[in-house]
């Protein structure tokens, strides 16, 4: 009879030990060169909604000619930008940006010019990318200009698309950049070995990766393409949180939940490629060989200088760096105190790093094609707004908390995961992630999903009331309101 109390006492003692939280993870300081970007144009955004309402009121017969004139004028401006070098602070770039945003209101009201508006965005993106080749994109002025142009162009186009979801063209051509590396065609897009796929997953953590940046973006994941020179079979080399570096077929890559994908390619006129046109293929082959030669764990610390473990961006950057091409011209920075505290609780230790969204701004790369899932575009924008609102809360002191009694179970799950991992299996807690980090990750995802569900309902009601979907700044207002409500209750 004495055995039972002894066993019970031991179990209580074990539970108490497993429930001890331990010290909070260290939070690295903000990068010296980092600071958050802010548009500071709230009044202008609100005025665009009024312009849209006025255009609807006067009707397309009056609004269409205005849109046609601006499309033509901005198209001519894009042509001029491709031939005249400007400083990133040039006033003409501010003017083009503002006119493009204003034009969105007319095209949203009268969609006859939607196709032309989308093509114009591609022309302007090409012009800004060309301009940026001469800029110091690591400097504040150039970085802000490239960001507000490329991110802003996409945002304006998608606001228009959300007004006319049945007219959305999912696949948009970019620049047809020549390449000497092996190629294949996947869903109508010719991809070459060494191309880089930048995508956005459909999970709460995907939205956090995309938005958790001094320059909040649209993308959360990087994969490097390898095309076999004989069979022309395409593979994607990528790093997953759950299983580290892995090789996927094209179908497996596309089968994983994605809201958008962009294909990037090194410019053919780069000096490194002029000397060795097969350099991108050699980089892809090197990544493929390493991925198949042994397990490479996921780098939760986001240390882009250490190739012993890799996060998704490092899969591409590490092999290209070995061959003389340094990607992410101008490193990503994460400065917000609340965001750094949250990311540190997940295991991140480096806040000057390589964020997926920022690769688009590297002037060494061109956009070959861009695909977006029209059916989930609204979800993409709502997730962004919710994350932005949650990060405002983090900056104000919101913590990622979990019930204390879940910690012992999580630690046992971590021990189980470690054990099965020795035999090549995958447990519930990824290698390199602590039990507490896993609990906080789950708490974050649950809260984001709950707020997003309420914002989705509120946005649907507002759409029914006013006859058009709320723009992003209104979604952000709704997200702030729902976040505050969740804090209270």
Name these PLM-found stretches.
Residues 2-489:
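Cysteine-nucleophile amide-bond enzymes
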């Amino acid at each position: 009879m004495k055995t039972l109390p002894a066993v019970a006492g031991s179990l209580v003692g074990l539970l108490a030990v497993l429930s001890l939280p331990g010290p909070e993870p260290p939070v690295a300081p903000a990068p010296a060169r980092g600071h958050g970007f802010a548009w500071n144009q709230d009044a202008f955004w609100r005025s665009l909604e009024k312009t849209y309402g006025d255009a609807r009121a006067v009707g397309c017969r009056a609004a269409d000619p205005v849109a046609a004139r601006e499309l033509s004028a901005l198209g001519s401006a894009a042509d001029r930008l491709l031939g005249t070098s400007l400083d990133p602070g040039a006033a003409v770039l501010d003017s083009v940006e503002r006119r493009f945003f204003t034009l969105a209101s007319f095209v949203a009201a009268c969609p006859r010019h939607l196709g032309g508006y989308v093509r114009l965005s591609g022309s302007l993106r090409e012009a800004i990318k060309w301009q940026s080749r001469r800029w110091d994109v690591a400097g504040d002025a150039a970085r802000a200009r490239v960001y507000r142009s490329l991110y802003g162009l996409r945002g304006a186009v998608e606001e228009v698309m959300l007004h006319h979801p049945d007219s959305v063209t999912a696949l948009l051509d970019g620049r047809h950049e020549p390449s000497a590396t092996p190629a294949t065609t996947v869903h109508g897009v010719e991809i070459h070995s060494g191309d880089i796929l930048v995508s956005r997953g459909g999970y709460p953590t995907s939205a956090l990766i995309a938005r958790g940046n001094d320059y909040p973006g649209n993308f959360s994941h990087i994969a490097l393409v390898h095309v076999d020179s004989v069979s022309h079979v395409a593979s994607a080399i990528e790093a997953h949180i759950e299983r580290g570096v892995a090789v996927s077929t094209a179908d497996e890559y596309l089968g994983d939940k994605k809201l958008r994908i962009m294909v990037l390619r090194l410019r053919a006129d780069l000096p490194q490629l002029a000397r060795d046109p097969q350099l991108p293929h050699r980089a892809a082959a090197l990544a493929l060989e390493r991925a198949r030669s042994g397990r490479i764990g996921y780098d939760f610390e986001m240390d882009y200088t250490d190739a012993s473990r890799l996060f998704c961006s490092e899969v591409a950057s590490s092999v290209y760096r070995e061959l003389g091409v340094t990607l992410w011209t101008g490193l990503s920075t994460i400065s917000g105190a609340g965001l750094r505290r949250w990311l540190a609780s997940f295991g991140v230790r480096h806040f000057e790093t390589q964020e997926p969204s920022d690769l688009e701004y590297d002037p060494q790369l061109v956009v070959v094609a861009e695909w977006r899932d029209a059916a989930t575009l609204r979800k993409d924008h709502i997730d962004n707004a919710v994350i932005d609102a949650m990060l405002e809360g983090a900056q104000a002191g919101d913590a990622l908390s979990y019930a204390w009694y879940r910690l012992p179970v999580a630690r046992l799950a971590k021990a189980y995961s470690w054990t099965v991992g020795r035999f090549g299996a995958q447990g519930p807690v990824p290698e390199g992630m602590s039990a507490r980090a896993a609990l906080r990750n789950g708490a974050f995802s649950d809260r984001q999903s709950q707020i997003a569900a309420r914002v989705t309902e509120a946005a649907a009601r507002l759409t029914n009331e006013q006859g058009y979907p709320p723009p992003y700044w209104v979604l952000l207002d709704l997200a702030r309101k729902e976040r505050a409500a969740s804090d209270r209750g």
